[in-house]
Structure formats: C-alpha cells, structure tokens
C-alpha cells in the first residue's frame, strides 16, 4: 500500500490525526497489519523503547549497580524476545544517528521515539555508531548461540558506557 493511501485510511478508519497517521504509515512501509500493530498500546516496541532508554541513561550516568539490575530483568525474557529487543536497539541506533541530519524523510520514528532521540541523538556519531551497532549484532549472535544472557547483556552494557563517550 502506498504511504499516502495508508495515511488516508488511518485518518478515516482509525480517526488518527494527520501527523500520527503519517508517522505510522511511514513506519509500516506499506504493511497494513504492521500499521495496526503500531497502534496497539501494549505494543512490544514500547517495552523495548523503555529498555533502550533505561540502558542508555544508566550507561551515561555510569550506574553499574543499576545496569546489573537492568541485565537481570532482560535475562528473564525468552531468547527470541531478547533477539527482537536487540533488533529494536539497532533500529533506534540508526534512527538516532539519522536524526542528527535533521531530515524528517530519513527518519522512521514514532512520536515517543523521536522525543527520546531529540536529546539522545547527539551522543551517536561517526566515532561510535559502527562499534555500537557491531556490539548489538555480536550480542544477538551470542544469544542465538545459547550464551548466558546475564553475561552477554552486562558485558554489552559496560561497553556502551565507553562507546557513548566517544566524540
């Protein structure tokens, strides 16, 4: 489905505001089911966003004890959910980097994601994006290979502390 058609359908059928309909249509990329999933308030992506925000804030503040607690929470998720969460983290990393270019056509974020990215994006730059992306990819691979989730996520959190400081 074309983005404009989906926007119109979301506005008419779901009574969304035009700006919200535009965002969801862009994120869904022609997939009506994905658009409806985005509208669901209990969306898994909302939980992933909360976990991403918590990770980045705790890493920035260097709160090792709280990062350990964050890791313990993540370890209770199933492996497939952990992998989906890491995919979401990679999505947020890309979107935060693209936000730095100040071109809305490059960005595919919900309003909540953009609210976080407008303050967070300055910490994602050319000096650290590749290493952070590789870190998320490696963590996903290790989880897929049945590694201990607590060790993988705590190691990842500690490395994020160092990588966020790169300018």
Placement of each model-derived feature along the sequence:
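Charged, glycine-rich active-site and insertion segments that engage polyanionic ligands
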Residues: 1-88, 92, 99-106, 111-167
